Amino acid sequence: MRTIIVGGGAGGASCGARLRRLDEKSEIIILEATDEISIANCGLPYYCSDVINDREKILVSNPQTFKQLLNVDVRLNSKVTSIDRKNKKVAINNQTELSYDNLVLALGASPLKPSINGIDNPKIFTVRTLSDADKIKEFIIKNNVKNAVVIGGGFIGVEMAENFIEMGLNTSIIEL
């Protein structure tokens, strides 16, 4: 029995671990489109400000650990580009096909980009992945940024603002 889990965030990683506890023999494959699995998203603001200065501390796990501890095959940079439900196959990166007995979609969330003029400006960032946080850090350092505006007053938005202030940036929050 082969189960394919599409998405390697917290939900996909937890699903893989739970499935392994329920069945020690089945084949479990996690397909993650990015180059990271199961990151500590709540730590991203603190990574941006270097309160957490070790990038590896944001990574909750890695493919090798999943294989060693759980016998779960994690494949990074493996974007599912189509699903053939009738024949029970997924296409990966428009190249490889994998068959499955069970399919779990654990696609997670994506940041909301409000419909406002200029939202696609290269100086505007979303923060959802470790790669996003890397880009924010790099931009702030490279451009000697002094001011920041955070759109969104949820947990991550407030923590981003807190950490921008920690970095010495004049920071405002806009809640839509």
Describe the predicted segments one by one.
Residues 1-4, 59-151, 166, 172:
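FAD-binding core/adjacent interface of flavoenzyme oxidoreductases
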Residues 1-72, 163-176:
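Beta1-alpha1 glycine-rich phosphate/pyrophosphate-binding loop at the start
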Residues 12, 157-158:
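N-terminal Rossmann-fold NAD(P) dinucleotide-binding loop
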Residues 84, 159, 175:
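Conserved acidic functional residues
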Residues 153-155:
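Short, glycine-/small-residue-rich phosphate/pyrophosphate-handling segment
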